[in-house]
């Protein structure tokens, strides 16, 4: 393209410091180096993880930074040695890459590729430098993506090619929240038909976990949230029962135990609250219940329960990105969406122009949105 090998000047939302609104700026995006791809971002969504880092409690948070990791767009140019992508390809950036050769990628039990983990955690490209600058200052990258910008540079292992007819303002959600929730029952818990399941927290991840339980054939899916306004949506995704946790004096584990003859086969924590993680484990059935942690708790927080809970046959697990090996799985999830097998549109509660990005954060903090998609 005419921009090939050139610095691109474009609009981005910059987080100059923690706890402050994002600032719309013109930034410079350098061309991709070896094994990097520069993409034009067409749509991006706002996730709680972006807010978590902006809030200042993320131990890996660095500023100034371009946040955003749920995005979709097209390849603008590729660096040297890139063979799997060409300009014009429809792509989704992946915050968990899949290099295909590290010991994690070679192990079928995990999706946690470690090839670029260290530099990604420091907000850098794999060579330890940044491609983003603003007003003479270098900006950090975020989660290997930085989609709150008209252009982004990502490692070629942190990207997948998807069907060109897939709408970017929908499939961007498969880059994080929807895939995270949907995969946990299928890949991590391996929910069997007829199982009973409970989902704690009815944000995008919780709703997607409900959908995963339904697809797995669960007979009962109990949705739990303090905000009963979330229940209507939960039923659309497949919840059979909805419970407000503090509606009774009894602990929620007792309420659920009475509803299910002793507890759930599977529970999913989609909040990121260590107290709820404990309740989710203790709501599992003795002898075989499994609880999966999906929520991200604040840095330094610890989970606790009595060892007897595990000695008597409960299992505590966790998952990142729903256990999906990213490069091979996300294109299939996009195909499933295009074929009507999984719901994605129903997660989009708001669509806003990119300039209204701070409003998207406000909607999320107020509990008024599931996902707000920003059109670039």
Swiss-Prot record:
<keyword id="KW-0862">Zinc</keyword>
<keyword id="KW-0963">Cytoplasm</keyword>
<feature type="site" description="Important for FDH activity and activation by fatty acids">
    <location>
        <position position="117"/>
    </location>
</feature>
<comment type="similarity">
    <text>Belongs to the zinc-containing alcohol dehydrogenase family. Class-III subfamily.</text>
</comment>
<keyword id="KW-0479">Metal-binding</keyword>
<keyword id="KW-0520">NAD</keyword>
<feature type="binding site">
    <location>
        <position position="113"/>
    </location>
    <ligand>
        <name>Zn(2+) 2</name>
    </ligand>
</feature>
<feature type="binding site">
    <location>
        <position position="99"/>
    </location>
    <ligand>
        <name>Zn(2+) 2</name>
    </ligand>
</feature>
<dbReference type="GO" id="GO:0004022">
    <property type="term" value="F:alcohol dehydrogenase (NAD+) activity"/>
</dbReference>
<dbReference type="InterPro" id="IPR011032">
    <property type="entry name" value="GroES-like_sf"/>
</dbReference>
<dbReference type="GO" id="GO:0106321">
    <property type="term" value="F:S-(hydroxymethyl)glutathione dehydrogenase (NADP+) activity"/>
</dbReference>
<dbReference type="InterPro" id="IPR020843">
    <property type="entry name" value="PKS_ER"/>
</dbReference>
<feature type="modified residue" description="N-acetylserine">
    <location>
        <position position="1"/>
    </location>
</feature>
<dbReference type="GO" id="GO:0080007">
    <property type="term" value="F:S-nitrosoglutathione reductase (NADH) activity"/>
</dbReference>
<feature type="binding site">
    <location>
        <position position="176"/>
    </location>
    <ligand>
        <name>Zn(2+) 1</name>
    </ligand>
</feature>
<dbReference type="InterPro" id="IPR014183">
    <property type="entry name" value="ADH_3"/>
</dbReference>
<feature type="binding site">
    <location>
        <position position="105"/>
    </location>
    <ligand>
        <name>Zn(2+) 2</name>
    </ligand>
</feature>
<comment type="subunit">
    <text>Homodimer.</text>
</comment>
<feature type="binding site">
    <location>
        <position position="102"/>
    </location>
    <ligand>
        <name>Zn(2+) 2</name>
    </ligand>
</feature>
<comment type="function">
    <text>Class-III ADH is remarkably ineffective in oxidizing ethanol, but it readily catalyzes the oxidation of long-chain primary alcohols and the oxidation of S-(hydroxymethyl) glutathione. Also acts as a S-nitroso-glutathione reductase by catalyzing the NADH-dependent reduction of S-nitrosoglutathione, thereby regulating protein S-nitrosylation.</text>
</comment>
<dbReference type="Pfam" id="PF00107">
    <property type="entry name" value="ADH_zinc_N"/>
</dbReference>
<dbReference type="GO" id="GO:0005829">
    <property type="term" value="C:cytosol"/>
</dbReference>
<dbReference type="InterPro" id="IPR013154">
    <property type="entry name" value="ADH-like_N"/>
</dbReference>
<dbReference type="InterPro" id="IPR013149">
    <property type="entry name" value="ADH-like_C"/>
</dbReference>
<dbReference type="InterPro" id="IPR002328">
    <property type="entry name" value="ADH_Zn_CS"/>
</dbReference>
<protein>
    <recommendedName>
        <fullName>Alcohol dehydrogenase class-3</fullName>
        <ecNumber>1.1.1.1</ecNumber>
        <ecNumber>1.1.1.-</ecNumber>
        <ecNumber>1.1.1.284</ecNumber>
    </recommendedName>
</protein>
<keyword id="KW-0007">Acetylation</keyword>
<keyword id="KW-0560">Oxidoreductase</keyword>
<dbReference type="GO" id="GO:0046294">
    <property type="term" value="P:formaldehyde catabolic process"/>
</dbReference>
<dbReference type="InterPro" id="IPR036291">
    <property type="entry name" value="NAD(P)-bd_dom_sf"/>
</dbReference>
<dbReference type="GO" id="GO:0106322">
    <property type="term" value="F:S-(hydroxymethyl)glutathione dehydrogenase (NAD+) activity"/>
</dbReference>
<feature type="binding site">
    <location>
        <position position="47"/>
    </location>
    <ligand>
        <name>Zn(2+) 1</name>
    </ligand>
</feature>
<feature type="binding site">
    <location>
        <position position="69"/>
    </location>
    <ligand>
        <name>Zn(2+) 1</name>
    </ligand>
</feature>
<dbReference type="GO" id="GO:0008270">
    <property type="term" value="F:zinc ion binding"/>
</dbReference>
<dbReference type="Pfam" id="PF08240">
    <property type="entry name" value="ADH_N"/>
</dbReference>
């Amino acid at each position: 393209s005419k921009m090939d090998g050139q610095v691109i000047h474009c609009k981005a939302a910059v987080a100059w410091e923690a706890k402050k609104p994002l600032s719309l700026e013109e930034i410079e995006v350098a061309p991709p180096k070896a094994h990097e791809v520069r993409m034009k971002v067409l749509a991006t969504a706002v996730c709680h993880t972006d807010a978590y880092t902006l809030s200042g409690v993320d131990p890996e948070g660095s500023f100034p930074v371009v946040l955003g990791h749920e995005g979709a767009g097209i390849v603008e140019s590729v660096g040297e040695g890139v063979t799997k992508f060409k300009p014009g390809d429809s792509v989704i950036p992946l915050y968990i890459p899949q290099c295909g050769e590290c010991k994690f990628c070679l192990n079928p039990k995990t999706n946690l590729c470690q090839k670029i983990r260290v530099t990604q955690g420091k907000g850098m490209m794999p060579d330890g430098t940044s491609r983003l600058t603003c007003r003479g200052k270098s900006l950090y990258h975020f989660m290997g993506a930085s989609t709150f910008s008209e252009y982004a540079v990502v490692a070629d292992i942190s990207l997948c090619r998807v069907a060109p007819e897939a709408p970017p303002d929908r499939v961007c959600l498969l880059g994080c929240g929807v895939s995270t929730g949907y995969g946990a029952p299928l890949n991590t818990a391996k929910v069997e038909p007829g199982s009973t399941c409970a989902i704690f927290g009815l944000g995008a991840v919780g709703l997607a976990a409900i959908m995963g339980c339904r697809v797995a054939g669960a007979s009962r899916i109990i949705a739990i949230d303090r905000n009963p306004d979330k229940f209507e949506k939960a039923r659309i995704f497949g919840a059979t029962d909805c419970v407000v946790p503090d509606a009774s004096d009894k602990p929620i584990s007792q309420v659920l135990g009475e509803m299910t003859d002793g507890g759930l086969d599977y529970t999913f924590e989609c909040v990121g609250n260590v107290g709820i993680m404990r309740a989710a484990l203790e709501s599992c059935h003795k002898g075989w219940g499994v609880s999966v942690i999906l929520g991200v708790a604040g840095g330094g927080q610890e989970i606790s329960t009595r060892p007897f809970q595990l000695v008597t046959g409960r299992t505590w697990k966790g998952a990142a990105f729903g256990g999906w090996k990213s490069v091979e799985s996300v294109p299939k999830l996009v195909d499933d969406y295009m074929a009507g097998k999984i719901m994605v549109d129903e997660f989009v509660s708001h669509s806003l122009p990119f300039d209204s990005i701070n409003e998207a954060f406000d909607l999320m903090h107020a509990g008024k949105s599931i996902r707000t998609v920003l059109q670039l």
